[in-house]
């Protein structure tokens, strides 16, 4: 494949160049692996000040190799993949099918089981609403957990308004679902269980294989929101007995606006479409497939599959470095979620006696989050953390750091230093912290209500 890489220049024009390392795109390491070298925090692509990016659960930067794969579809192979009467359509269709094959390989599926969508939100809506409505005459019960992504919870709530019964399973303090409780909750009326693979807020990895086994033994379809899992942890839909699986492009260094839904063919999962039209994508998702975005998703999956072990080792190394740097230098902190059953690109940690939003503003040179980007406009404490039993003040003090493929040691070290400085500064302003330093147990204080 041509390794030419796109370079952003100051006037906004995109030009093709090869093996660039001046202000930001290509370096080659000792392992013959190509990396995009992202701009340092004191300069952006066009030279402006840019913060360090540690919000990988919100979105990831597009891998330059993905961008490279997409460019020809903007300039040469721009045909509609559904046009069957000329070469433009044939070429575009071939590229889309090649991308479909690459997406299928990363989860061990058949390419015919991959449906292109606009993202994981649409995939989740199709899976949950589509299965529930198709089988509603026979079964009307769905099971999920209280810590799912908003798109899953809202889909279930909409089904409740249509007359379906939904059970929202609690999770333990570690964020994991109780398998015995799941098993005992399934009834003859249960059509679908939907439990996410990796939680977007706390990084906890659910026991997907065990959940799939329970569902298969009980004749219940199993959907998992794998937006935060695909390309990060190994997934095999057959070994794990997964029937439906949601994928997001921009969570794996691919483009925004594209995703995929795996729909099992044997045993066949039937879906009532929620979008009608031209009958594309096996009639499940009508609408012209955005061939450029689909190819980008395919390229992202191909890279992620080949480099998953390397990425995982790098992310774990940086996670350990960040966690040690925080815990060695800042007292009274707590990691949220299970310490072992987790994806190490996600560190959600609470800083006692510090308001999370205040800390985010104080460390503005680091782009991170106090929770899901989908709910970040709300000042309410995270519903995921509250579901774990985290006290409200600790939930308010949580920060999520997202580590990824292109994160550097220098960025982690800078983050540790800026946290040390600003957590202490904010605590010094807190009368509660002063009382704790004096040995007062503030939980025993009866505060007057005025």
From Swiss-Prot:
Keyword Hydrolase part of the UniProt annotation: no
Entry keyword set: Iron, Iron-sulfur, Metal-binding, Mitochondrion, Nucleus, Pyridoxal phosphate, Transferase, Transit peptide
A biological-process GO annotation: [2Fe-2S] cluster assembly
Ligand binding ([2Fe-2S] cluster): 374
UniProt catalytic activity: (sulfur carrier)-H + L-cysteine = (sulfur carrier)-SH + L-alanine
Gene Ontology CC annotations of this record: cytosol; L-cysteine desulfurase complex; mitochondrion; nucleus
Modified residues (N6-(pyridoxal phosphate)lysine): 251
Positions bound to pyridoxal 5'-phosphate: 120-121, 200, 228, 248-250, 288
Catalytic residues (UniProt): 374 (cysteine persulfide intermediate)
Function in brief: Catalyzes the removal of elemental sulfur from cysteine to produce alanine. It supplies the inorganic sulfur for iron-sulfur (Fe-S) clusters.
Cross-referenced PANTHER family: CYSTEINE DESULFURASE (PTHR11601:SF34), CYSTEINE DESULFURYLASE FAMILY MEMBER (PTHR11601)
Family: Belongs to the class-V pyridoxal-phosphate-dependent aminotransferase family. NifS/IscS subfamily.
Family annotation (NCBIfam families): IscS (TIGR02006), PRK14012.1 (NF010611)
HAMAP family: Cys_desulf_IscS
Protein name: Probable cysteine desulfurase, mitochondrial
Organism of derivation: Dictyostelium discoideum (Social amoeba)
């Amino acid at each position: 494949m041509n390794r030419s890489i796109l370079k952003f220049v100051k006037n906004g024009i995109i030009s093709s160049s090869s093996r660039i390392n001046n202000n930001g795109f290509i370096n080659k390491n000792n392992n013959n692996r190509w990396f995009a070298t992202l701009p340092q925090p004191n300069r952006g692509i066009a030279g402006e000040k840019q913060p360090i990016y540690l919000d990988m659960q919100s979105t990831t930067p597009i891998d330059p190799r993905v961008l490279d794969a997409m460019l020809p579809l903007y300039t040469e192979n721009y045909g509609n993949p559904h046009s069957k009467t000329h070469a433009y359509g044939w070429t575009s269709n071939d590229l889309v099918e090649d991308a479909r094959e690459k997406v299928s390989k990363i989860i061990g599926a058949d390419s015919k089981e991959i449906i292109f969508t606009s993202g994981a939100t649409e995939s989740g809506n199709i899976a949950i609403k589509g299965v529930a409505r198709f089988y509603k005459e026979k079964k009307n019960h769905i099971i999920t957990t209280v810590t799912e992504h908003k798109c899953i919870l809202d889909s279930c709530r909409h089904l409740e308004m249509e007359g379906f019964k939904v059970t929202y399973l609690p999770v333990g303090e570690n964020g994991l679902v109780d398998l015995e409780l799941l098993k005992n909750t399934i009834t003859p009326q249960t059509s679908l269980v939907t439990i996410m693979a990796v939680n977007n807020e706390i990084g906890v990895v659910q026991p997907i294989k065990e959940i799939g086994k329970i569902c298969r033994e009980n004749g219940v379809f199993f959907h998992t929101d794998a937006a935060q899992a695909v390309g990060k942890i190994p997934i095999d839909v057959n070994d794990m007995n997964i029937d439906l699986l949601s994928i997001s492009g921009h969570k794996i260094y691919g483009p925004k606006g594209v995703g995929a839904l795996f729909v099992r063919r044997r045993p066949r999962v039937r879906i009532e479409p929620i979008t009608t039209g031209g009958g594309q994508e096996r009639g499940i998702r009508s609408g012209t497939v955005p061939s450029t975005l689909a190819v980008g998703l395919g390229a992202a999956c191909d890279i992620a599959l080949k480099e998953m072990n390397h990425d995982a080792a790098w992310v774990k190394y940086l996670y350990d470095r960040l966690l040690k740097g925080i815990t060695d230098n800042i007292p009274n902190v707590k990691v949220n979620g299970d310490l072992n059953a987790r994806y190490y690109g996600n560190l959600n940690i609470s800083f006692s006696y510090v308001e999370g939003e205040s800390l985010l503003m104080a460390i503005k040179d680091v782009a991170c989050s106090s929770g899901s980007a989908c709910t970040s406009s709300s000042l309410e404490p995270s519903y995921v953390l509250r579901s774990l039993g985290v006290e409200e003040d600790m939930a308010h003090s949580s920060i999520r750091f997202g580590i990824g493929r292109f994160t550097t040691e220098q960025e982690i070290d800078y983050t540790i230093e800026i946290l040390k400085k600003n957590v202490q500064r904010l605590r010094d302003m807190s009368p509660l912290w002063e009382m704790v330093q004096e040995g007062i147990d503030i939980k025993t204080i009866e505060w007057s209500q005025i």
